[in-house]
C-alpha cells in the first residue's frame, strides 16, 4: 500500500498522523509513505526526524475577517493544488489521508479530484474549517467524538478514535512511577498544562503547594520547560513538601500516564484520546485560547459521560483545584466509577480501526 499523508500546523494534527504511520508499518511492512506539509510548520522538522519522506507546499489559512490576505490565500491554495497534483502523480498513492490543518486542504482536494480514495481525520469535537470544506469531496470522515459527527455528511462518517490512543497501551505504569520518583503504594495525581505548560495552572499550583503537603496522596507537577525556573523560585519561598515532585518536562509520558491514578490537564484531543484509552479519570481545565473554544467542547464530551470533572480557567484557584482532586482521589467509589466511564469512552485500537477504513477504500 502506498499512503500519502498530510496534516500540520500543530502537534495535534501531526502526532496522530505519525501514530497511524507507525501502526501501518507494523501491520504492513511493505507500505510506503509520503508526507506533505508546509516548509515552516512543525511537521517540517518532526516528520523527517521520524524517517518519513517529506515534501512541502506553500499555503496559509483563511483570516476570519474580510482581508486582502484572503485573496493571497486563494492564490496559494490554487498553486498548492497544482503542486500537490504533481507530488501525487509522482508518488502514485493508493490512498490519501488528511489529519487537519490548512496544509491538507489542497493536498486532499487534489487527490479527490484525481479520483484517488481520500479520508480526513478530525480529532476535535468541533471540526476545523479545512476538514469541513474537504468533507464535501472525500470518501470518508473519521471522527473521535460523537459531537463532531453532526458537522459532516452522515453517510461518510466513521468513528475511529485518535491513533495516538494506541501508543499509550501496553506501557509499564510501575516503571513510569519509579522514573519520576513516585512511590508505588500511594495514590498519585499528575498535573500538567500541555507540552509547554500553562501559566494559570502554574499559578494555582504554587498557591496550593502548602495545602498539598498535608495530603495522603502524591502530586507530580509538570511546569513546562519555559516556566520551570519561575515556578521553582516561587516554590522555594513556600517550601517543597516531600509528597510533591516538580518536573520541567516528562519524556516518557505514556508510561507515567499509565502509572498515576488521576490526571489534571488541558482538554486537547490527543490528551483525551490517551486518557480514555487508559481508563484514566481526569480534571480538565480547557484552554480558553483555542479556535472555536473546542477544548471546552472536547471536555464536555467526556464530562457528560462521567469520566471527568471540568474546571474552567476563570474558576481556577488553589481551592478549586484541591477540591476537585480530593473529591476524586479520596473517594474510592468515585475514582472507580470514573475509571469505568473513561474506559468505556476509550478507543485503544484507534490506529487499527483507521487502517481498516483505509483498506476497505483501497479494495473498493
Curated annotation (Swiss-Prot):
Alphabetically ordered keywords of this record:
Cell cycle, Cell division, Cell membrane, Cell shape, Cell wall biogenesis/degradation, Glycosyltransferase, Membrane, Peptidoglycan synthesis, Transferase
Topology in the membrane?
A: Peripheral membrane protein
Quote one Gene Ontology molecular function term. undecaprenyldiphospho-muramoylpentapeptide beta-N-acetylglucosaminyltransferase activity
- The domain of life is Bacteria
Q: Which GO terms describe its biological process?
A: carbohydrate metabolic process; cell division; cell wall organization; lipid glycosylation; peptidoglycan biosynthetic process; regulation of cell shape
Instruction: Show the Gene3D superfamilies listed in the entry.
Output: Glycogen Phosphorylase B
Record has Membrane as a keyword: yes
Pathway the protein contributes to:
Cell wall biogenesis; peptidoglycan biosynthesis
Specify which residues bind UDP-N-acetyl-alpha-D-glucosamine according to the UniProt entry for this protein.
10-12, 124, 195, 250, 295
What is the uppermost EC class here?
transferase
Annotated localization: Cell membrane
What Enzyme Commission number(s) appear in the record? 2.4.1.227
Q: Which reaction does it catalyse?
A: di-trans,octa-cis-undecaprenyl diphospho-N-acetyl-alpha-D-muramoyl-L-alanyl-D-glutamyl-meso-2,6-diaminopimeloyl-D-alanyl-D-alanine + UDP-N-acetyl-alpha-D-glucosamine = di-trans,octa-cis-undecaprenyl diphospho-[N-acetyl-alpha-D-glucosaminyl-(1->4)]-N-acetyl-alpha-D-muramoyl-L-alanyl-D-glutamyl-meso-2,6-diaminopimeloyl-D-alanyl-D-alanine + UDP + H(+)
Task: Return any one Pfam family short name.
Answer: Glyco_tran_28_C
Alphabetical GO CC annotations of the entry are: plasma membrane
Is Hydrolase among the key words of this record? no
- UniProt xrefs under InterPro entries: GlcNAc_MurG, Glyco_trans_28_C, GlycoTrans_28_N
Role summary: Cell wall formation. Catalyzes the transfer of a GlcNAc subunit on undecaprenyl-pyrophosphoryl-MurNAc-pentapeptide (lipid intermediate I) to form undecaprenyl-pyrophosphoryl-MurNAc-(pentapeptide)GlcNAc (lipid intermediate II).
* Alphabetized NCBIfam families for the sequence: murG
Stated family: Belongs to the glycosyltransferase 28 family. MurG subfamily.
Listed name of the protein: UDP-N-acetylglucosamine--N-acetylmuramyl-(pentapeptide) pyrophosphoryl-undecaprenol N-acetylglucosamine transferase 1
Q: What organism, scientifically named, is this protein from?
A: Bacillus cereus (strain ATCC 10987 / NRS 248)
Amino acid at each position: 500500500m502506498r499512503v500519502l499523508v498530510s496534516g500540520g500546523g500543530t502537534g495535534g494534527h501531526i502526532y496522530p498522523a505519525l501514530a497511524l504511520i507507525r501502526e501501518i508499518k507494523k501491520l504492513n511492512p511493505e507500505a510506503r509513505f509520503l508526507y506533505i506539509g508546509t516548509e515552516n510548520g512543525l511537521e517540517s522538522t518532526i516528520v523527517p526526524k521520524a524517517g518519513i519522506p517529506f515534501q512541502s507546499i506553500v499555503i496559509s489559512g483563511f483570516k476570519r475577517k474580510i482581508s486582502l490576505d484572503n485573496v493571497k490565500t486563494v492564490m496559494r491554495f490554487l498553486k498548492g493544488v497544482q503542486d500537490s497534483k504533481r507530488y501525487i502523480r509522482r508518488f502514485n498513492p493508493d490512498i490519501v489521508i488528511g489529519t487537519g490543518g490548512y496544509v491538507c486542504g489542497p493536498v486532499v482536494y487534489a487527490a479527490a479530484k484525481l479520483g484517488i480514495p481520500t479520508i480526513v481525520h478530525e480529532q476535535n469535537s468541533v471540526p476545523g474549517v479545512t476538514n469541513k470544506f474537504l468533507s464535501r469531496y472525500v470518501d470518508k470522515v473519521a471522527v473521535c467524538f460523537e459531537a463532531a459527527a453532526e458537522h459532516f455528511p452522515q453517510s461518510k462518517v466513521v468513528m475511529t478514535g485518535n491513533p495516538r490512543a494506541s501508543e499509550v497501551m501496553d506501557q509499564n505504569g510501575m516503571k513510569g512511577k519509579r522514573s519520576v520518583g513516585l512511590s508505588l503504594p500511594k495514590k498519585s495525581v499528575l498535573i500538567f498544562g500541555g507540552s509547554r505548560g500553562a501559566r494559570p495552572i502554574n499559578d494555582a499550583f504554587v498557591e496550593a503547594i502548602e495545602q498539598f503537603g498535608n495530603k495522603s496522596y502524591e502530586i507530580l507537577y509538570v511546569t513546562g520547560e519555559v516556566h520551570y525556573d519561575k515556578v521553582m523560585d516561587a516554590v522555594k519561598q513556600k517550601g517543597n513538601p516531600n509528597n510533591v515532585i516538580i518536573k520541567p518536562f516528562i519524556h516518557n509520558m505514556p508510561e507515567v500516564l499509565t502509572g498515576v491514578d488521576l490526571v489534571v490537564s488541558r482538554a486537547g484531543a490527543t490528551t483525551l484520546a490517551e486518557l480514555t484509552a487508559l481508563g484514566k479519570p481526569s480534571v480538565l481545565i480547557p484552554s480558553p485560547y483555542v479556535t472555536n473554544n473546542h477544548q471546552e467542547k472536547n471536555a464536555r464530551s467526556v464530562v457528560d459521560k462521567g469520566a471527568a470533572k471540568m474546571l474552567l480557567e476563570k474558576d481556577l484557584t488553589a481551592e478549586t483545584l484541591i477540591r476537585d482532586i480530593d473529591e476524586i482521589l479520596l473517594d474510592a467509589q468515585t475514582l472507580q466509577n470514573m475509571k469505568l466511564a473513561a474506559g468505556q469512552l476509550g478507543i485503544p485500537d484507534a490506529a487499527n480501526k483507521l487502517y481498516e477504513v483505509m483498506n476497505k477504500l483501497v479494495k473498493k
